[in-house]
């Protein structure tokens, strides 16, 4: 009797001729997630089995795999010979002592002498005799015992399903550059896009010494949380202090946020292209803050020359975003009270619906290209 973990995937079976590519990416991502743990991953009949591990590490393996996009459900199972006595011993081990239950059997081995219903009925009856605190409920059971009879002469016995992260394997839908701040929104945006199979790289803008090193460390932690779902990531760190000082010195203060965001988008696009990214990703949510009006988004987006901008949070309210932040494990980090660059020289009344003619007039007061080049020269790259 060996403990194994059954991993079932989400949408890969829909991919037709590309299915092999998606399955290989999925298996590679699971291997990366389990790095440092002795194990073997084997594909079997439209699912994967994790085998050969120290049984004391089964919970850690499930925890790691729960962050791998593409995982639909998992089950910690016992692998036994396709023999009714062996199957019953495994069922007795994984089942509770009391409550309601039913047995569900899937019989891939059509040579087995009993059909699925007969197996479920016999095993269920034997379990009732063995554990007097159990009762059968086929409609709304507290426990569902699964039995999978495989074609290789083994049976997998498990108690229930563990929900995975869902989505598609990271790396199957290209690569994008996430503008990540120290707030709640941007890590959630990156998480949502990664769930659809995109590899996510990050870029962060800081204003040291106006912002402190704790603010930077906070962003590194948030990027590390995201990296747990994306099989690692790269964090690009760019200093924009000189840009803010120039805007503060030469431009109407009401346009500080608008002008700074346009610089960020230009810089992000250039670094994204060099890194092989195919889009930019932001945590903007329509109407959530003053700068995130449609006019503000149009202003910042208009400077991006050739990459699409993905804004996955546009239709979410703040509570929905917070729920997702909590679920991914980023919220407690995001709410630490360290300021980011957007709070430096923040005007009392920032322009909410900027007009393009006014923006261009303010921008004409600046050496845009020179400021961009100076910012890019400060680039630091961290592998997480």
Regions flagged by a language model, labelled:
Residues 1-177, 187-233, 351-356, 380-384:
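RNA-binding accessory domains that recognize and position tRNA/RNA substrates
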Residues 14, 68-78, 111-112, 206-270, ...:
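ATP-dependent adenylate-handling ligase core
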Residues 52-56, 250-251, 294-298, 347-359:
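Short glycine/threonine-rich loop-to-helix capping motif typified by GTGT followed
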Residues 122-127, 161-173, 244-245, 249-323, ...:
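Active-site adenylate/phosphate-handling loop in enzymes that bind or generate adenylated species
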Residues 183:
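Conserved G/P- and acidic residue-centered "switch" motifs that form tight phosphate/ATP-binding loops
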Residues 203-205, 238-241, 282-283, 312, ...:
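Generic beta-strand/beta-sheet core signal
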Residues 332, 336-384:
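The feature marks non-catalytic terminal segments
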């Amino acid at each position: 009797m060996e403990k194994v973990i059954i991993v079932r995937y989400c949408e890969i079976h829909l991919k037709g001729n590309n299915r092999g590519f998606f399955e290989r990416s999925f298996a590679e991502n699971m291997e990366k997630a389990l790095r440092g743990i002795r194990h073997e991953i084997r594909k079997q009949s439209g699912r994967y089995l994790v085998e050969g591990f120290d049984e004391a590490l089964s919970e850690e393996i499930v925890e790691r795999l729960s962050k791998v996009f593409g995982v639909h459900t998992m089950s910690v199972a016992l692998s036994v010979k396709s023999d009714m006595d062996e199957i019953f011993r495994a069922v007795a081990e994984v089942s509770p002592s009391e409550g309601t239950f039913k047995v569900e059997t899937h019989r891939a081995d059509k040579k087995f002498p009993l059909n699925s219903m007969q197996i479920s009925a016999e095993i269920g009856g034997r379990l009732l005799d063995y554990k007097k605190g159990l009762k059968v409920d086929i409609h709304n059971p507290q426990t569902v015992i699964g039995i999978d009879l495989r074609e290789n002469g083994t049976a997998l016995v498990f108690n229930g399903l563990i929900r995975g992260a869902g989505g598609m394997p990271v790396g199957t839908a290209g690569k994008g550059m996430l503008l990540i701040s120290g707030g709640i929104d941007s890590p959630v945006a990156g998480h949502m896009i990664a769930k659809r199979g995109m590899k996510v790289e990050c870029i962060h803008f800081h204003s040291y010494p106006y912002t402190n090193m704790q603010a930077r460390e906070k962003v590194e932690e948030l990027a590390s949380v995201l990296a747990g779902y994306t099989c690692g990531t790269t964090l690009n760190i760019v200093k924009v202090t000189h840009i803010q000082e120039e805007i503060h010195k030469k431009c109407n203060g009401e346009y500080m946020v608008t002008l700074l965001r346009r610089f960020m988008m230009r810089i992000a696009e250039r670094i994204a292209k060099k890194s092989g990214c195919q889009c930019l990703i932001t945590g903007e949510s329509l109407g959530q803050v003053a700068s995130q009006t449609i006019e503000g988004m149009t202003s910042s987006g208009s400077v991006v020359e050739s990459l699409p901008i993905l804004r996955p949070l546009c239709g979410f309210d703040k509570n929905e975003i917070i729920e997702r932040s909590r679920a991914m494990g980023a919220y407690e980090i995001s709410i630490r009270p360290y300021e980011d660059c957007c709070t430096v020289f923040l005007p009392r009344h920032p322009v909410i619906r900027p007009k393009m003619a006014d923006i261009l007039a303010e921008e004409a007061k600046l050496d845009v290209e020179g400021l961009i080049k100076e910012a890019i020269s400060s680039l630091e790259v961290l592998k997480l």
